[in-house]
Amino acid sequence: MTPNSLQEEQNSPDIIRHLVLLGDALQNIDLGKGQAENALVPRPRNPWKLTVLQPPEVLQQGRVRAIPAGVTHIGICVDGGWAIETSGLLKGRAQSIQDALDTLAAAADEFENMFTRLMTAATEAGVPTIVCTLVPARYMEPSQERVAATALAIFNDRILRRATAARLSIVELRLVCDEDSDYASETLLSHAGVRKVANVARSALYDISRNPGRTRVYF
């Protein structure tokens, strides 16, 4: 490879050199020993760095100040369990359908506000960005599974509407994580599941870096 071609490759917009993950999706997942970068992408085509920013870090520091200098790509991925737990639908029984829907709507409003602020931080950074939908849980109890899936659909609808309005592309994790082997527990992904998500997300970032301008859905 000639020096010029090497320089062109290093400057290519699809080269992920510093990925910032906005969200807590990796917070409770055991990626094993060593660097998270190696667990997510075992054989990368170039050295890269991962910075994870929890939502409070972004919201407390202010949008622009939270994103580190040198970021080349951003992914927004929030733990779906957070949304479900906040809704309160899996704890006890509502007095009526109206009460249940009101509780869910209030939790979805709070979630949407937080998620919108994360998207604003990403768009202000001006780098290729993807938004991930919430990963569905796999509860053993059928009734719990139905309730969780219903609640998750409401939160994911908020994500899809906001991401589309912001012209951000989407990784649809409900279609990516569709096998039992993708899960280490009812609510946490396995190494295989995390690797699958990383592969789809990486492909999405490569694509939108070279072909920006419109919202796409990847799975």
Q: What are these language model-derived features?
A:
Residues 1-58, 64-69:
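Serine-esterase "nucleophile elbow" of acetyl-processing enzymes
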Residues 2-5, 13-18, 63, 67-72, ...:
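Conserved catalytic region of serine esterases and O-acyltransferases that act on ester linkages
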Residues 20, 29-31, 72, 129, ...:
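Generic detector of intrinsically disordered, low-complexity, polar/charged segments
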Residues 30, 34, 178, 196-197, ...:
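Residues in flexible loops and secondary-structure boundaries
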Residues 38-41, 89, 93, 213-216:
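A sequence-level detector of short, solvent-exposed, charge-rich linear segments
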Residues 62-191, 195, 199-202:
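Alpha-helical cap/lid subdomain in secreted, periplasmic
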